[in-house]
Structures are given as C-alpha cells and as structure tokens.
Amino acid sequence: MRTVSMAALVVIAAALAWTSSAEPAPAPAPGEEACGKVVQDIMPCLHFVKGEEKEPSKECCSGTKKLSEEVKTTEQKREACKCIVRATKGISGIKNELVAEVPKKCDIKTTLPPITADFDCSKIQSTIFRGYY
C-alpha cells in the first residue's frame, strides 16, 4: 500500500516541477532514483489531493516548491512526466481539481496540465506548462 501512496504523489510533484520560465543548464533527467526523491518531497500532499484534508500541509507546500525549483529543462519535464505515467497506472482517488489547487494554495506560480495515467509526455514544451500542447 505504501508504494501506491508514494506513486500517487509523484503525480503532484512532477506536475508542479514544470514551472520555469527559462531553461537553465541541464541537470540529470529524473529517473528511478529521482522519482523516489520526488515522492519523498511531496508525500505530505497525498491527503489533500485525495480530498482527505481541506488544505495542503506546510510540508506539502515546501516539498512541491522545492521540486518546482529543481526540474527545469524540457527533457527533465518529459522524464518526470514519464515517471508520473508509470506511477499512476491503476491508482484511484487522486482528484485532478485538487492537484490543480496545490500551487494556488501553496503560492507557487504555475499552471498544471491534466494529470492522468495516459498523458502524452511528448506534448510538454520548454517553458511554462501553459504551452504544453
């Protein structure tokens, strides 16, 4: 059960990571190890995005903000997206409307794409997510 919960959080983290308006020097693309780090950073968001809490916790906000500052390049965004797609297959209970609320409630400047297990990661563009299609 812990694996499913952790995988669900990858959805939030990777989506929030695509917030940069500029392309910094490339860093290693998120792989399996990075997906684990993403999960660790945003684990506190699970209760909020499943509708079990009215507000995201302080830990949820700090973890998602940290992640949004780390994943910047198009390749990093696409790799994180692939991680989300793998992690969300078969997971239920995540409410997309609440995922979209995390940045607003945490005062993180971003626009999020749809968070689904079949999202086409190749649609992710280079800057902010408003241009992901």
Curated annotation (Swiss-Prot):
Protein name per UniProt: Probable non-specific lipid-transfer protein 2
PROSITE patterns, A to Z: PLANT_LTP
One Pfam family per UniProt: Tryp_alpha_amyl
Record PANTHER family: NON-SPECIFIC LIPID-TRANSFER PROTEIN 2-RELATED
InterPro entries registered for this protein in UniProt: Bifun_inhib/LTP/seed_sf (IPR036312), Bifunc_inhib/LTP/seed_store (IPR016140), Plant_nsLTP (IPR000528)
Upper lineage: Eukaryota, Viridiplantae, Streptophyta, Embryophyta, Tracheophyta
Secretion signal span: 1-31
Disulfide bonds: 35-83, 45-60, 61-106, 81-121
Family membership noted in the UniProt record: Belongs to the plant LTP family.
Function: Plant non-specific lipid-transfer proteins transfer phospholipids as well as galactolipids across membranes. May play a role in wax or cutin deposition in the cell walls of expanding epidermal cells and certain secretory tissues.
GO biological process: lipid transport
Alphabetical UniProt keywords: Allergen, Disulfide bond, Lipid-binding, Signal, Transport
Highest taxon in the source lineage: Eukaryota
GO molecular function: lipid binding
